[in-house]
């Protein structure tokens, strides 16, 4: 049985214990003897990051085990499997693993690039059992290095995998505020009290108590601290987001930005290996960060209505079911199939977080769900599922647009053009599901682009930036020549040529509108129009020139991104833009 399947079997136990902890906290809060440590958005975010970590481990886990096995095969000094599979061998391997884990964990707090991976586990400002499941998706990229001593010593890969899972599962129960000090146990083992210290941002607790199972490593190496004052949780640079993708990327992005901006070549490297918080002097001078003050710490709790919270909980439950099914069968799936479902589940988790932040409406989340399922089913050839979700995605987006633009201040022509473009696209989606209706489908999308040209011309006129028109027509001409020489049938050369001209004009109109308006919303619409060109280019290449791997994945992903960027961000002419782009002209 694989680790992923063991995690699946352990999931009901995890949720049972989370439920018990939640009820205990609520009761203690009512009695005045404790407090409730759970907030629904934070819990969904932590559990969602746990799901993302597990489903991505289907890919990254191969790296970790593969490199370990290769090293063991080549360099093992004592590869006696009989010894290592006796009780004393298992125990020695577990202690050995825990020692290696201590140093990985410690360097994860003392080296910025390793902190970039580990920070995910510390971002929650609450401390409960859901925090235990909040794990990184990038830790395996470098973490395997710290376990190579086990491979060289001769610990077999199977034994390594089992003790790694035991060490990980042990750490689940220590993430709670509902269990106090445990006397002698605290002196030898990682316990709730010891691990609360590790998660705290108090000055006296920073970079302490790294042990996974045994706390004696911290006592031996001088990093132990007892819990002697209330803990404040989170990180000193709070995430302030429910976005699981950004949670994994935020520190990498900050390091890359500082590395890019510093002028000294040595600092471009040092920023990655120095302790977290270290910054090149020249970067810190132009972009200083305020000193941490624990008295200023505020919990991130954006307002979300009860209905949105209920929807997010239901959405998460469905994503959890999908992730469980994926983990159970992942060992039998081809790599491409795993990548497709990983992308679909990630899209759903991202959309759930965005809804809880108020960045997406429920309708937009439903569109993303339908689009993800349409894309996945199309890429994997699941015809019946694709036949349902491909038209459903655009139908949901039409409903969203009707609701968003029905206000009296929205001009009727603006709304009609947007809806016309979406309805024509829906008709094209349906027709293109049958190869014999390619030309009628092409005509529907041509009409959609004409509607979008009229929509984007509102308030700015036709083609306000001739250079943009020249560029998109040039790109279209190159693509058309590529199709022509690649085998475009003679009967399709005129309709496809006409379509290329119209979609290029649509993209040029969107780009020109963005240049005139100068706001982020119009820029997103322009990106959407460009995605439309990319999607259709991929579709035509796959149909007429050469077969692309999992073509439907790339075609539909860019197509749905295009439609959402247009429908969600296009604005009537004259509407005030609160997200005006900064003026990039030089100042005097």
Describe the function of each predicted region.
Residues 19-44, 388:
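Membrane-interface helix-loop junction between the first two transmembrane segments
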Residues 59-79, 102-110, 380-383, 403-412, ...:
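Transmembrane alpha-helix boundary signature
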Residues 16-27, 57, 372-380:
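Alpha-helical transmembrane segments of multi-pass membrane proteins
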Residues 360-588:
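Polytopic alpha-helical membrane-helix bundles and their juxtamembrane interface segments
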Residues 51-63, 83-240:
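Membrane-embedded catalytic scaffold of the fatty acid hydroxylase/desaturase
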